[in-house]
Regions:
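Conserved acetyl-CoA-binding loop-helix of GNAT-fold acetyltransferases
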Residues: 88-101, 128, 238-241, 247-264, ...
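Phosphate-binding active sites in nucleotide-utilizing proteins
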Residues: 174-186, 193-207, 211-222
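Conserved hydrophobic beta-strand within the GNAT/NAT acetyltransferase core sheet
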Residues: 78-80, 111-115, 236, 270-274
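C-terminal "cap" of GNAT-fold acetyltransferases
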Residues: 139-159, 166, 268, 273-279, ...
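Glycine-rich acetyl-CoA-binding "A-motif" of GNAT/NAT acetyltransferases
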Residues: 49, 60-63, 121, 209-215, ...
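A short beta-loop-alpha structural element at the N-terminal edge
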Residues: 3-15, 157-171
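Acyl-donor-binding surface of acyltransferase catalytic domains
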Residues: 69-75, 83-154, 299-301
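Conserved donor-binding loop and adjoining core beta-sheet/short helix segment
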Residues: 9-12, 19-106, 115-116, 214-232
Length: 310
């Protein structure tokens, strides 16, 4: 009989086995290392995190699920990982219902879930449980990490961001998603918390000599397992330029600086995600050497409306 219970510190190795068995079955997916999985779920110092559960059968972990912060207050991301040998037995559904109940107790407005398009049955499954397609994205990779040439843009400088720039970073974020529907309305304090929590390095494009800051590139470290060993990689989480300053080469200049930063850190690959209907961004990334790895869809459940299907 399968039992769902909160995560305990000794569960990490069992979770890792489930994670890597699942990755082996997925096209384009990378395995995890022990340290990478612990970092991803905030399991340092053997703490028990809120929002992480395992499914256990016969003393073995066969699946796990957790809630992670999304990009704005009131949103959470649901992740359910089931060992391939255990799929189709209802374990994933039981964990998903558990996550929805936990998210509702936290007064969450929206719960998101990500599924690769190579497995359309999972999207159908999420829709059965009340989720709806939200945004369709492409995962891209640059390997080896070679930064192409990018000329400086006259009248603008690219520099590392500091705490005083967080208000400008929030304004750029909000201008990139004016309806606030995708990532919510950012503010300076929220952006500062994000940088501190993620360890991101942010570079900005600033009009000289007196401003304003008009673009940003956010780079952070990720970790995958290659041949069973943890390998650090670069991840470009956000690249944005204020609408009035586009078509000047600032986006390319910021992207190249982000790639250079990844190379300086010795990361063997750079990864990013982009909306599939964002043709200018797709062209920019392809022109700098990024190649498509896999497509995925983000689904969203509005928790204030409708129960989870049984």
């Amino acid at each position: 009989m399968t039992r769902i219970r909160p995560y305990q510190p000794d569960d990490l190795d069992g979770m890792l086995g489930v994670q890597n068995a699942s990755a082996d079955a997925e096209a384009g997916q990378s395995g995890a290392s022990r340290s990478g999985l612990a970092s991803y779920w905030g399991l340092r110092d053997r703490r028990r995190p809120a929002g992480l559960w395992v499914a256990e059968e016969g003393g073995q972990i066969v699946a796990y699920a957790g809630l992670r912060p999304w990009h704005s207050l009131g949103w959470l991301q649901a992740e359910v990982v089931v060992h391939p040998a255990e799929r189709g037995r209802g374990v994933g559904g039981a964990l998903l219902r558990h996550l929805v109940r936990a998210a509702r107790r936290r007064s969450t407005a929206y719960l998101c879930a990500i599924t690769p398009d190579a497995h359309p049955d999972r999207g159908t499954y999420l829709e059965h449980h009340g989720f709806q397609p939200f945004v369709r994205r492409q995962h891209m990779r640059l390997e080896p990490v070679v930064a192409p040439a990018a000329a400086d843009v006259p009248g603008f400088a690219v520099r590392a961001a500091g705490p005083a720039d967080c208000g400008a970073l929030a304004r750029i974020n909000n201008a990139s998603y004016p309806a606030g529907d995708r990532v919510g309305r950012a503010d300076a304090a929220g952006y500062q918390r994000f940088i501190e929590a993620s360890g991101a390095q942010v570079w900005v494009a600033e009009q000289v000599p007196a401003g304003p800051v008009v673009g940003l590139c956010e780079v952070r470290q990720a970790e995958v397992a290659l041949n069973g060993a943890p390998v650090r990689t670069g991840h470009i989480g956000s690249l944005a330029v204020l609408p009035a300053y586009r078509q000047r080469g600032l986006g390319r200049r910021l992207l190249v600086r982000g790639i250079e930063l990844c190379r300086e850190n010795g990361w063997p690959t750079v990864e990013l995600n982009v909306d599939r209907d964002n043709e200018p961004a797709l062209h920019l990334y392809e022109s700098t050497g990024f190649r498509a790895v896999y497509a995925f869809t983000v689904y969203r459940l509005a928790l204030a409306a409708g129960p989870l299907a049984p």
